[in-house]
């Protein structure tokens, strides 16, 4: 068996199928398991998804005390425990890097109205 076949089998076995469909512009909360020495704790990150790469890596941006902070998460890692989508936004770009230069209300995105089918 080739090493590439082995790597593909391992990657498929670790793939998490219960992830919600995340798109750029969504406001999400990501819960991450952090190990510090012998202790483990759960930390929660919330922000706007400004980029998405190959269904696996997302970049989340939020403003904290007037400073923009960006987190990059690989969604297939076992440290990412859960992802919840708070809100969808209406956008027309695949990357939202222009939000880095905006401050205040100009950095907000328009809400997308999601219809509920009965």
From Swiss-Prot:
Q: Name one GO cellular component term.
A: ribosome
Keywords for this entry?
Chloroplast, Plastid, Ribonucleoprotein, Ribosomal protein
SUPFAM superfamilies per the record? Translation proteins SH3-like domain
Question: Which superkingdom heads the taxonomic lineage of this protein's source?
Answer: Eukaryota
Please provide, alphabetically and separated by semicolons, the GO molecular function terms listed in this UniProt record: structural constituent of ribosome
Cellular localization per UniProt: Plastid, Chloroplast
GO-annotated biological processes:
translation
- Disulfide bonding pattern of the chain: none
Q: Which InterPro entries match?
A: Ribosomal_bL19, Ribosomal_bL19_CS, Ribosomal_bL19_sf, Translation_prot_SH3-like_sf
Q: Which family does it belong to?
A: Belongs to the bacterial ribosomal protein bL19 family.
Give the PANTHER family listed for this entry. Answer: LARGE RIBOSOMAL SUBUNIT PROTEIN BL19M (PTHR15680:SF9), RIBOSOMAL PROTEIN L19 (PTHR15680)
User: What is the name of this protein?
Assistant: Large ribosomal subunit protein bL19c
Species annotation: Bigelowiella natans
């Amino acid at each position: 068996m080739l090493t590439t076949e082995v790597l593909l089998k391992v990657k498929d076995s670790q793939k998490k199928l219960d992830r919600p469909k995340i798109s750029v512009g969504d406001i999400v909360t990501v819960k991450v398991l952090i190990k510090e020495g012998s202790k483990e704790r759960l930390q929660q990150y919330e922000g706007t998804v400004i980029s998405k790469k190959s269904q696996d890596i997302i970049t989340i941006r939020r403003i904290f005390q007037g400073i923009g902070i960006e987190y990059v998460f690989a969604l297939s890692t076992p440290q990412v425990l859960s992802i919840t989508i708070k809100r969808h936004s209406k956008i027309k770009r695949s990357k939202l890097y222009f939000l880095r230069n905006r401050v205040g209300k100009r950095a907000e995105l328009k809400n997308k109205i999601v219809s509920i089918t009965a």
